[in-house]
UniProtKB/Swiss-Prot annotation:
Gene: bpt
Family statement drawn from the similarity comment of this UniProt entry: Belongs to the R-transferase family. Bpt subfamily.
Gene Ontology biological process: ubiquitin-dependent protein catabolic process via the N-end rule pathway
Catalytic reactions of this protein: N-terminal L-glutamyl-[protein] + L-leucyl-tRNA(Leu) = N-terminal L-leucyl-L-glutamyl-[protein] + tRNA(Leu) + H(+); N-terminal L-aspartyl-[protein] + L-leucyl-tRNA(Leu) = N-terminal L-leucyl-L-aspartyl-[protein] + tRNA(Leu) + H(+)
Source taxonomy: Bacteria, Pseudomonadati, Pseudomonadota, Betaproteobacteria, Burkholderiales
Protein name: Aspartate/glutamate leucyltransferase
UniProt key word Glycosyltransferase: no
Tree of life domain: Bacteria
Function text: Functions in the N-end rule pathway of protein degradation where it conjugates Leu from its aminoacyl-tRNA to the N-termini of proteins containing an N-terminal aspartate or glutamate.
Pfam families (alphabetical): ATE_C, ATE_N
Record GO cellular component, one term: cytoplasm
Source species of the chain: Cupriavidus pinatubonensis (strain JMP 134 / LMG 1197)
Keywords of the record: Acyltransferase, Cytoplasm, Transferase
NCBIfam families the record matches: PRK01305.1-1 (NF002341), PRK01305.1-3 (NF002342), PRK01305.2-3 (NF002346)
Length: 266
């Protein structure tokens, strides 16, 4: 019998969900293509799926599979060529003092409290601000791949030493890091925690000697997702090919629908 790590992508099955309300674009319906069974999706297989445009939520591995909309475009940063712009350099200077601790996925009550505060202030009414502990754990702390939790705190000796500012979940792939989810202190109005987190992940990807930081989906029409285009050079996946992001050349209107999982042209 083949070992799990040797099983090919063809051992998986893919099915489409029923339509549901899109969480990114108001008034639209969405569908997802789901990869199963979950126990066959180890770190190696998941790396290939991410290159084909998939993401995960807990042990649920999926990608957009909508009937008429192709607004969700997978994107990744070429970390060796990345140069921060002026506002990104300011964010790094503002938050570079934070102390980062990388750990396995673990439940911490302090993290959960910050998550609820973040959801209540940044995504009120979206449903996630009412997540129970079980829902939080299923969403962020369950994984069958190589995942890490990173917490960012004020350093010793600072006025608010030890204060939790941000928590980020990342997956380690064979060709980079994948940014899973991030939540942070929403009471700091002049902070740029989200930008700093991506800059930190870019630096970590470089230090690991890996070429890509996967940022999930870029959605031109979604204010929550459009910020990803600021991290250049950026590549986007259209059909089965990764290509350079161009403001006028790749958009929600031109992005191709996903093909069946298969070889991806790098």
């Amino acid at each position: 019998m083949s070992k799990l790590k040797e099983l090919p992508l063809s051992a998986l099955q893919f099915y489409a969900t029923a339509p549901y309300a899109c969480s990114y674009l108001d008034g639209r319906m969405a569908r997802s293509q789901v990869a199963t069974p979950a126990h066959l999706i180890n770190a190696d297989v998941y790396s290939r799926l991410v290159r084909a445009g998939f993401r995960r939520s807990g042990i649920f591995t999926y990608r957009p599979y909508c009937d008429e909309c192709h607004a969700c475009t997978p994107c990744r940063v070429l970390v060796e060529q990345f140069e921060p712009d002026r506002s990104q350099r300011r964010a790094w200077r503002r938050h570079g003092h934070l102390q980062a601790l990388v750990a396995p996925l673990t439940y911490v009550e302090e993290h959960y409290s910050l998550y609820l505060l973040y959801q209540s202030m940044r995504h009120a009414g979206g449903g996630m601000d009412q997540d129970s502990r079980d829902q939080y754990e299923q969403f962020l702390l369950q994984s069958r791949v190589n995942s890490r939790l990173v917490e960012f705190r004020e350093p010793p000796g600072s006025p608010e030493a030890g204060k939790l500012r941000m928590v980020s979940m990342i997956d380690v792939l064979d060709d980079g890091l994948s940014s899973v989810y991030t939540f942070y202190d929403p009471l700091e109005r002049n902070a740029s925690y989200g930008t700093y987190n991506i800059l930190w992940q870019i630096r970590q990807t470089r230090e690991l000697g890996l070429p890509h930081l996967y940022l999930g989906y870029w959605i031109a029409e979604s204010r929550k997702m459009a910020y990803k285009a600021r991290f250049r050079p950026l590549q986007v996946l259209t059909g089965n090919q990764w290509q350079a992001f161009e403001d006028d050349g790749v958009s929600a209107a031109t992005a191709a629908p996903p093909d069946e999982p298969g070889p991806v042209q790098e």
